[in-house]
């Protein structure tokens, strides 16, 4: 049974990206995955201070917050999903902060062989205009994977045209997220 960790990074409670996370989770569970869904907005993750103490000592980050727990969960997962709304053509501040703090996950980077990652993003822009937004966010995701060294990109879902919280509920994007979840 594969362990699947889904990290939803929207600061909004009834977020469209959260709906897609739950659809992905349902598909992954039906495929036999053991799924854990975490909302980053509920976690205390401070900004990286750039002190490099984690690199110099090899003992992780000196900041005592929820990032330590999240890095451990990433280490235990076979598959992880990063989900975000698109804000100003990139990932949410919550996801960017998580990515920046992952420098303290050096051990994860050395032991990440065989792990797979998925990316889910939601843009309020209509599909015809959302492509540029998604390209920038996809670049942030792929850059993160490159830093992790040996994590395989398993799938990307870029939803568009969904502005109001919950407006994605009755769209084709839900089925696409569910089907992508079944591929774990």
Predicted regions and their residues:
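Short, glycine-/small-residue-rich phosphate/pyrophosphate-handling segment
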Residues: 93-94, 107-154
């Amino acid at each position: 049974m594969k362990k699947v960790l889904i990290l939803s990074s929207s600061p909004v409670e009834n977020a469209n990206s959260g709906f897609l996370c739950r659809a992905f989770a349902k598909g992954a569970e039906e495929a036999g995955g053991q799924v854990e869904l975490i909302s980053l907005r509920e976690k205390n993750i401070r900004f990286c201070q750039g002190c490099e103490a984690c690199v110099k000592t090899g003992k992780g980050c000196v900041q005592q917050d929820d990032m330590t727990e999240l890095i451990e969960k990433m280490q235990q997962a076979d598959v992880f999903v990063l989900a975000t709304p698109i804000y100003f053509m990139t990932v949410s501040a919550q996801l960017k902060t998580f990515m920046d703090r992952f420098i303290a996950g050096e051990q994860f980077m050395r032991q990440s062989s065989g792990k797979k990652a998925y990316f889910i993003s939601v843009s309020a822009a209509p599909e015809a205009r959302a492509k540029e937004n998604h390209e920038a966010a996809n670049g942030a995701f792929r850059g993160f994977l490159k830093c992790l060294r040996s994590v395989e990109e398993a799938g990307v879902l870029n939803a568009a045209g969904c502005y109001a919280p919950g407006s994605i509920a009755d769209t084709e994007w839900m089925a696409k997220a569910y089907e992508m979840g079944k591929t774990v």
